[in-house]
């Protein structure tokens, strides 16, 4: 339950980011081309990234990445390749765009899609055994005695939070005009890379 609750906003961010990219400037490659060109301005790659085919590739691959990555990382057969693509995507964004800590945070939070015990696979057996012995001595209650399920009140509050996260990103639809230009309803709508006007 708790792990799915943490995965939900991450998935929502990716999917709503993909939905936000379904617009003419992004799909035609104009917005991604301007962003990439600005990010690599003055480098030897600047002329190459301004090619229309490269801009289209960036636009469409970014859109597909946003829609597919949460589900590809959740599904065990595609998890490793999906995580590798997330590492490349977020590392690229960190170095090319000025969007602060978001790419690194998103990269680390992508590990939420793995099984809960995945870190154990990387820890040597002798360390696991020592940790287990120490933990068993310190623990006052057995896991069977702990109530790991949320109360009805907490479920109600969490349901309201989920509803808000589902609805608020679409409030821009109630403002007349094109959100990309007037930016009404832009905040909290997962439209981070779409403020570039072309």
Residue ranges and their predicted role:
Residues 158-198:
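Membrane-interface segments at or immediately adjacent to transmembrane helices
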Residues 12-15, 19-22, 67, 183-196:
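Hydrophobic/aromatic-rich, well-ordered segments within soluble, folded domains that form packed cores
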Residues 57-116, 172-177, 181:
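Membrane-water interface signatures at transmembrane helix termini and the short loops
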Residues 15-18, 70, 91, 166:
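Hydrophobic residues within the alpha-helical transmembrane core of Major Facilitator Superfamily
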Residues 1, 9, 13, 105-128:
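Hydrophobic cores of alpha-helical transmembrane segments in multi-pass inner/ER membrane proteins
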Residues 7-65, 133:
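Membrane-interfacial catalytic/cofactor-binding modules of polytopic membrane enzymes
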Residues 1, 120-151:
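Membrane-interfacial, low-structure loops and terminal tails that flank and connect transmembrane helices
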Residues 2-5, 47-57, 78, 146, ...:
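Membrane-interfacial loop-to-transmembrane-helix junctions in polytopic alpha-helical membrane proteins
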